[in-house]
Amino acid sequence: MDFVFALHSHLPYVLNHGRWPHGSDWICEAAIDTYLPLLAQLEQLERDQIATPLTIGITPILANQLASPVFRDEQEAYFAQRLKTCGEAAESLAGTGDAHLLPLARYWERHLLELRDRFRKYNGDLAAAFRHHEEAGRVELISCAATHGFLPLLSRDESIRLQLGLGRAEHRRIFGRDPDGLWLPECAYRPRGPWQPIPGGPAIPDRAGIEEFVTEAGYRYFFVDSHLAAAGHAFRLYGASGGSAEGGEIVNSPYRAYRVAGSQGPTPVNAFVRDPVSSRQVWSRQEGYPGDEWYLEFHKIRWPGGLKYWRVSAPGSDLGDKQPYNPEQARHRAGDHARHFVSLLGRIAAQAGGQGGQGGQHAVQGGPASAPSAAPASSVIAVPFDTELFGHWWYEGVDFLGQVYRELGRQAVVTPVTARDHLRQLPADRAVHLTTGSWGANGDFSMWLNPGTEWTWPRLWAIEATFWDAAPSALAAPAQHLVLAQAAREMLLAMASDWQFIISTGAVTDYAVKRFTEHCSDAEFLISALMPDATHLSAAQSRAAELWERDHVFPEILGAIKLVSDGKALS
């Protein structure tokens, strides 16, 4: 039985939008916590000749930042600040009752120095570092919508086409090849049908499903949460083993890839379904590995300095009762959990074999992982996660990931593969009509459309309408190209699903509101200069040049706008 481990790497555009607490420090922290440790782990496994067929998604907006000279400078400054903090922390600990934490302060200093050396080894270009591993055939890199726009709620088909097509083009520009796979932002999907997200708002009686845009953009597959497939209707493909296209009722198993069915039948696009059993073990602090008592406590931080010295400790313990962190013991637990995880995969494979690959019930019983019933050849366990879970939220997660691949190499029950290789070797023999939903809270769109965020959508929809109405004439006027291109960038940055998500969580609402309104205002001003009766094109050109220095992304966007405006695919 195949096993696909997929990671989704994303941050909104933060360069040139401040530093602390929510600006460039956001991406610099992610680089230290997750991206650099992950690259270090991949290199170590390569040296040890351990196969790591990871499927790694990097959103185009993140890839633009990771390849940026601005990021390189910001990261160097961040390293300097953090290393200075480590030195000051050691001095402050020495004269307090917390002197026993001094070895941990030195541990963090060594860790940061190692990461800085690695960063400089890559010349500060982390996108190129990930590209190296794909070119070596060790991982598969996949793409996403350009700025992680929440596709089901965008009002214009052209906007969806630009998000997907530009995302694909940017992936090709930065990583050197076309991606087969797509990470749908927030794993959000809607089928063909009526569209009216807000009662009384804009309505379209029959709108194309997301899979139609994905097909048009040239992608071969995406990932969905299990409830989108479980609630849909599955059927065998004509000519596949088992009969005709309507060959009887089929229980929708999460342990297979499906062709996504549209209104006219199966499309060329496939969907991998997230396994709820093994996934929960990895992401849940309450039920899974990250809540183990020996792992680093995320929430307790010592100020000044901002360093973490404590472990999770007893379940439910107060922050004041946390015990000192032991890195060696934590690494040992990561190995234990990796062995447990691979054993769990074996039990899932055994159950899938015993149920003929249906796997409709997700309870997995104990038992040896070494002698499962034969699972159907097309079976696959897919576990997609946010990359930032590993290292940032769960500090030991990167070590766990590396140990998982070591353990997988010691058994023969499940076979680790990239998503692309699974489909090449075992094409899907069933199709499914997916239902509307996402992998967010409640499994629907409510994290992005709710009373606290509803105000954002009419403003965004108005920008979409005026932009696409203005685009054809602006494309025909070279003097307007600079303004048109930057207006598109600002519109795309405003579309990032991050802003509604942050507002809904209540974490840093002011920052999300500021960024959303800022990009909307800039887009509105630039678009207004493209109107037939506009008299401020010169002022808009100056503003567009200023914004290009600030929001320096997607250098080839004008060609993508032209293709979309002409009704051509960007694949």
Protein language model features and the residues they cover:
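Active-site and substrate-binding clefts of carbohydrate-active enzymes
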Residues: M1-A51, I58-P103, Y238-G354, P372-S571
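Active-site-proximal, glycine-rich beta->alpha crossover segments in alpha/beta enzymes
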Residues: V70, Q75-E135, L141-S155
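Aromatic- and glycine-enriched glycan-recognition loops and surfaces
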Residues: A30-Q41, R120-D125, S159-G167, G200-A208
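Short, solvent-exposed turn/loop segments enriched in Gly/Ser/Thr/Pro and often Arg
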Residues: G57-L62, A145, G181-A188, H227-L228, ...
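Non-catalytic regulatory/linker segments of enzymes
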Residues: S155-E158, Q163-R168, I174-P179, L184-I198, ...
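Catalytic domains of cell-wall/extracellular-matrix polysaccharide-remodeling enzymes
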Residues: G165-R168, R173-N252, P376, I381-Q411, ...
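Compositionally biased, intrinsically disordered low-complexity segments enriched
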Residues: G354-S373
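Acidic (Asp/Glu)-rich catalytic clusters
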Residues: E43-Q49, D125-I142, R172-F175, T215, ...
